[in-house]
UniProtKB/Swiss-Prot annotation:
Protein's recorded name: Histidinol dehydrogenase
Gene from which this protein is expressed: hisD
Enzyme Commission number: 1.1.1.23
Catalytic residues, chain numbering: 326-327
Textual note on the cofactor: Binds 1 zinc ion per subunit.
One GO CC term on file: cytosol
Record organism: Gluconobacter oxydans (strain 621H)
UniProt GO BP: L-histidine biosynthetic process
Keyword RNA-binding annotated: no
Stated family: Belongs to the histidinol dehydrogenase family.
Required cofactor(s): Zn(2+)
């Protein structure tokens, strides 16, 4: 864990090192992913069956790769009632928030008599990638599927690996809640390829969303342009801005809630109180002694964690904007005032009773957020990822006579004679 102080000599260099330190894994998966995608594109279902046997130790004919409605219902029925209630609560809140995001169409006539508009229409088909096995996350199903449903996407196809044939009941229950009926027991880059290019079994989709390992992320990168994708997700990250009035144990737990995700995850505390910084560091050490995922969390905290002592909240805001974190917790008396200074963050959690874990499950806004400082230019997943804009222009003869001459002049200036003629011939009639 790195300790930085903005009043110390060399802070700028140390902070630059902190920004550059993460995500330097040199292991390239580009070539094996490229080979898998080419194979799926060439051999289709046969390749899917081969990779499923190889990576998931599951040998099935192509027609059995789709999970039947009976299997989905049977697995979902195994979920305890309290967990189903929790899924329903999360689904209700996620759906409500994303429904409020839906934009309205635009239609007006301007001062030249030209009718202008903009229509929003949903994508036809979306592919959902869901990690499988023991590390399956039903919350990710809700966060990816529900915005698509709210947006009006008619077809949702989901791919989830089932190592050794084991299905995850919670994942299937979440899919059932979202109305996802087309589910395949396929994972990895091969699943991304199947959804992007299509096979006899799986019709191609228009956009692929959902988290995955390095192979899945690279596959999404390589199929982008053929289909849309949500983002290339990096390791999770949180920045906690806290004053000395906080319980150091709560701050420690919030930091470790990110650290336990992945050895590459990053958790950073920013505070104006140097004494509190020490108490928080000690609290992290104590929690790591009993945390079930202590090996992962300890590695993350040791390699990528940081505590930064600042001279003012204004300075804290500058650092947050430079970090552009995926998650920002503001544990201050006036969290809204501080948040007003923040330009770059995927999601902001305000107040001492709003840990980032609220947003992971039951807050309502999406937990699929920009990582690796991409919050400088990107946003979290929303209904806008599943709809697109089409602009409309309607002009009658009178309207064209008002604006057409300017168009003719510009077309001639660009040397595009047919463009100019398509306007001028209409203007010369009558």
């Amino acid at each position: 864990m790195k300790r930085l102080d903005t009043s110390a000599a060399g802070f700028s260099e140390d902070f630059a090192t902190l920004l550059a330190a993460r995500g330097s894994d040199e292991r390239s998966v580009a070539e094996p992913v490229r080979a898998i995608l080419a194979d799926v594109r060439s051999r289709g279902d046969e390749a899917l069956c081969d990779y499923t046997a190889r990576f998931d130790r599951l040998t099935l004919p192509a027609e059995k790769l789709r999970i039947s409605a009976e299997e989905i219902a049977s697995e979902a029925a195994r979920v305890p009632a309290d967990l189903m209630d929790a899924l329903r609560t999360a689904a209700r809140r996620i759906e409500t928030f994303h429904a409020a995001q839906m934009p309205k169409d635009l239609d007006f006539t301007d001062e030249d008599g030209i009718r202008l508009g903009m229509r929003w229409t949903p994508l036809d088909a979306v592919g959902l990638y869901v990690p499988g096995g023991k590390a399956a996350y039903p919350s990710s199903v809700l966060m990816n599927a529900l915005p698509a449903r709210v947006a009006g996407v008619k077809r949702l196809a989901m791919c989830v690996p089932s190592p050794d044939g084991v299905l995850n009941p919670l994942v299937l229950a979440a899919a059932q809640l979202c109305g996802v009926e087309e589910i395949y027991r396929i994972g990895g880059a091969q699943a991304v390829g199947a959804m992007a290019f299509g096979t006899d079994l799986i019709a191609p989709v228009d956009r692929i969303v959902g988290p995955g390992n390095a192979y899945v992320a690279e596959a999404k990168r390589q199929v982008f342009g053929h289909v849309g994708i949500d983002s290339i997700a990096g390791p999770s990250e949180v920045v906690v801005v806290a004053d000395g009035q906080n319980d150091p144990r709560l701050v420690a737990l919030d930091l470790l809630a990110q650290a336990e995700h992945d050895e590459q995850a990053q958790a950073i505390l920013i505070t104006t109180d140097a004494a509190f910084a020490e108490r928080a560091a000690e609290a992290v050490r104590k929690e790591l002694e009993t945390l079930p995922r202590t090996a992962i969390a300890s590695k993350s905290w040791e390699d990528h964690g940081a505590i930064i002592v600042v001279r003012s909240l204004e300075e804290a805001a500058e650092i947050v904007n430079a970090l552009a974190p995926e998650h920002l917790e503001v544990m201050l008396d006036a969290p809204r005032d501080f948040s007003a200074m923040i330009r770059h963050a995927g999601a902001i959690f305000m107040g001492r009773y709003c840990p980032e874990a609220v947003g992971d499950y039951v807050g309502g806004p999406n937990h699929v957020l920009p990582t690796s400082r991409t919050a400088r230019f990107a946003s979290g997943l929303s209904v806008f990822d599943f709809i697109k804009r089409t602009t409309t222009i309607e002009a009658d003869e009178a309207g064209l006579r008002r604006i057409g001459p300017a168009g003719v002049a510009l077309a001639k200036a660009e040397g595009l004679d047919a463009h100019a003629l398509s306007l001028s011939v209409r203007l010369e009639k009558n």
